[in-house]
């Protein structure tokens, strides 16, 4: 029925359907782009294991960081090569849980300490050196009041977990405190940190020995089954 009201209604209905389909396609495409962008951002962030040593005087301690998103598992490695102390850190919720593998206990670690306020002079030298498979830049942080100079050799590889980790742990040692004084340090990790007095005497050294990228199991960052909570009396 050409020119009839039925034909007009049919044409209008088809136009509405076409417009709705186009809008739906645009909405789906926009959602797809956002999802891809989010996945790409997450894919770029470092996930894997970082092994390093801490030297203080004659004492050398081995550690491992297991990193996955907002979660970091810190293991202190014994001379036998197994984990003798473990901390589970959630940098989003700002919580720290300590695990005792020997005693099958876990404990919430409160952090009531105020951040340490120090006056420092920071110099990003631009000097480069290869370390642990990375090209690292030399940063020097100095404080006359604290009688300390710390030289960091930092690598940039989307180590986005590190600054939130330091803020969550809120440690008072100079290696951590001084690093937080550096502006625009997001995404880097110190492959070597040497703490010295102003007269040159070495106080401590943190040195990365191995970096392995790879997907980490979510269970690494959970309290294991069978662990009991340690209650303070």
Indicate where each model-derived feature is located.
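Extended soluble regions of mature proteins
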Residues: 44-233
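Sec/Tat signal peptide C-region and signal peptidase I cleavage site
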Residues: 39-43
């Amino acid at each position: 029925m050409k020119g009839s009201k039925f034909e007009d209604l049919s044409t209008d209905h088809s136009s509405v359907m076409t417009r709705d389909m186009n809008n739906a396609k645009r909405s789906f495409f926009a959602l797809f782009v956002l999802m891809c962008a989010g996945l790409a951002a997450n894919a770029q962030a470092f996930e894997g294991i970082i092994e390093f040593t801490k030297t203080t005087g004659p004492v050398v301690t081995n550690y491992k960081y297991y990193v996955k998103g907002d979660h970091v598992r810190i293991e202190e490695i014994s001379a036998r090569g197994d984990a003798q102390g473990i901390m589970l850190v959630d940098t989003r919720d700002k919580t720290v849980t300590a695990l005792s593998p020997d005693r099958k206990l876990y404990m919430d670690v409160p952090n009531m300490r105020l951040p340490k306020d120090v006056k420092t002079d920071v110099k990003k030298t631009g000097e480069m050196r290869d370390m642990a498979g990375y090209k690292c830049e030399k940063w020097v942080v100095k404080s006359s009041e604290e009688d300390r100079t710390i030289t960091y050799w930092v690598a940039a590889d989307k180590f986005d977990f590190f600054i939130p980790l330091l803020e969550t742990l809120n440690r008072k040692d100079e290696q951590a405190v001084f690093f937080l004084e550096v502006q625009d340090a997001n995404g880097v990790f110190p492959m070597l940190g040497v703490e010295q007095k102003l007269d040159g005497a070495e106080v401590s050294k943190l040195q990365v020995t191995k970096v392995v990228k790879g997907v980490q199991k979510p269970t690494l960052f959970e309290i294991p089954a069978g662990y009991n909570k340690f209650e303070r009396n």
